[in-house]
């Protein structure tokens, strides 16, 4: 029976995620490598990936460049106090900008009026300030206040890792 039509195999799915969460190895055929590691054939491996994507467990499989190695060493989390009536439209607009890697709506907190967050990356400090100004112009009068939190040092940078997590 094919992996993609059998009942959910939680162990196989978890193993696939553990094998791929840090990226695929740079080998001639990463799908064959993954299939061998999983102990299934390549077609079933691809079917499992497709099922996980269709179920929404993974969004996509793609190359993710290391922006630091490409010279983009400056980043800032821009924070914006945006009119709630406009945030859905404006959040989509800001998130579509090529220099924005993450864009989130968050609830305001006491003493922290910001509800829209957008991470920008640039080669130098002037780049990220220019991007902040571009966002400010796009938001127009719907923006009441803003700030930018600039990183001073990377303490940890990884995606979600399931390997080693224990069930409680």
UniProtKB/Swiss-Prot annotation:
Pathway the protein takes part in: Porphyrin-containing compound metabolism
Keyword entries, A-Z: Lyase
Reactions catalysed, as given in the entry: siroheme + 2 H(+) = 12,18-didecarboxysiroheme + 2 CO2
EC class (word): lyase
InterPro entries tied to this protein: AsnC_trans_reg2, HTH-Siroheme_Decarb, NirdL-like_HTH
EC number(s) given by UniProt: 4.1.1.111
Gene3D superfamilies, sorted: 3.30.70.3460
Gene ablation phenotype (knockout): Insertional mutagenesis results in the loss of respiratory nitrite reductase activity in vivo and in vitro. Mutant strains synthesize a periplasmic cytochrome cd1 that lacks heme d1.
Function: Involved in heme d1 biosynthesis. Catalyzes the decarboxylation of siroheme into didecarboxysiroheme.
Family membership noted in the UniProt record: Belongs to the Ahb/Nir family.
The protein's assembly and partners: Probably forms a complex composed of NirD, NirL, NirG and NirH. All proteins are required for the total conversion of siroheme to didecarboxysiroheme.
Name by which UniProt lists this protein: Siroheme decarboxylase NirH subunit
Top-level taxonomy: Bacteria, Pseudomonadati, Pseudomonadota, Gammaproteobacteria, Pseudomonadales
């Amino acid at each position: 029976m094919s992996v993609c039509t059998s009942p959910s195999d939680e162990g196989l799915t978890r193993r696939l995620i553990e094998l791929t969460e840090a990226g695929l190895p740079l080998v001639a055929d990463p799908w064959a490598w993954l299939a061998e590691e999983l102990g299934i054939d390549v077609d079933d491996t691809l079917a499992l990936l497709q099922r996980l994507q269709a179920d929404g467990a993974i969004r996509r499989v793609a190359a993710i460049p290391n922006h630091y190695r490409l010279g983009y060493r400056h980043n800032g989390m821009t924070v914006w106090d945006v009119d709630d009536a406009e945030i859905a439209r404006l959040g989509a607009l800001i998130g579509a900008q090529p220099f924005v890697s993450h864009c989130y709506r968050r609830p305001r907190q006491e003493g922290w009026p910001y509800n829209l967050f957008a991470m920008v990356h640039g080669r130098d400090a002037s780049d990220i300030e220019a991007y902040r100004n571009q966002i400010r112009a796009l938001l127009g009068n719907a923006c009441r206040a803003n700030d930018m939190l600039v990183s001073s040092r990377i303490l940890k940078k990884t995606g979600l890792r399931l390997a080693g997590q224990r069930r409680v």
